[in-house]
Amino acid sequence: LRLLGIVLAMVAPSIVAAQKPAAKSAAKPAPKPLFSDPIYDGAADPVIIWNKQRQKWWMFYTNRRATDTTAHGVTWVHGTRIGIAESGDGGTTWTYRDTANINYRSDRGYTHWAPDIVEDKGLYHMFLTYVPGTFTDWNHPRVIIQLTSPDLQNWQYVQTLPLITDKVIDASVFRLPDGTWRLWYNNERDHKSIYYADSPDLRHWTDHGQALNERGEGPKVFRWHEQYWMIIDQWKGMAVYHSDDLLHWQPQPERILEQPGQGRDDQAIGGHCDVVVSAGHAYVFYFTHPGRSKANPAPANSIAAKRSVIQVAELEFSNGKLKCDRDKPTYVQLLKPRK
């Protein structure tokens, strides 16, 4: 009996250990939707960045005025501010914080769209689409402006980028292997194709023309699995391209986030995304118009058709291609960046 007791004492801890769930299974999956704006219910165009001062993740997004009952035409997507949400649990849950204090309001009814943000030498740089007013249609100039901030909350104007036309939107900025910078954007005057500009120092920019002869907006460039990737919004899902040199891009036949999901507010195409790579995982943050699902569309111009929310899914790499299953539970685990 004594020998049996010794054996049981040795075996019991291993049984308990075997029954203990893995750390990942104990975590909660991200909710659907991931985030809804409490002011206008029109969150879109997300970008995620680590806030060094607060030691939390921040999400910046275009705050479309979906619930504005006085809007007519497309005024509800103009006159917009940039909202901020915060996550203290590695990106699983997000809480509305404020709108960004952007010190560039040169025109009455000014419009801020689709920021991208990078950090360099302790200073944050925002590249923001600026529209000089609130308009009922799309036929007006738009430029990309650069602002800087020490704290991600308060932003000072630096310059308007010298890009190729006066109708450009949706900056995506990436540090090249040699330490210089490249910015991709949508040139609306050239069939909404993707153009690019380079800078040695984030201050002086040279436009090099077309990067991708494809219609699309909201380019996002990132590195994962020893390749560079670009994802663009084609209004029918997200087109994927890969490159070895950040100049020559090969298309992937299949789009991602084209087929509707089953989760709450995720039954429409995914649009204008950000991708965060952390600890070998890549998470795609995108927005949907829940009221624009093909199966059950809301009436045109209704609040239900205008509202938008942020969702998240984990990217998967298989046979040289990117894919994602938006219906899989997504365990977001964004780690503090090493820098």
Q: Predicted segment positions?
A:
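Bacterial N-terminal signal peptides that target proteins for export
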Residues: 1-4
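Hydrophobic h-region of N-terminal signal peptides that target proteins for export
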Residues: 8-17
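Carbohydrate-active catalytic/glycan-binding domains of CAZyme proteins
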Residues: 19-339
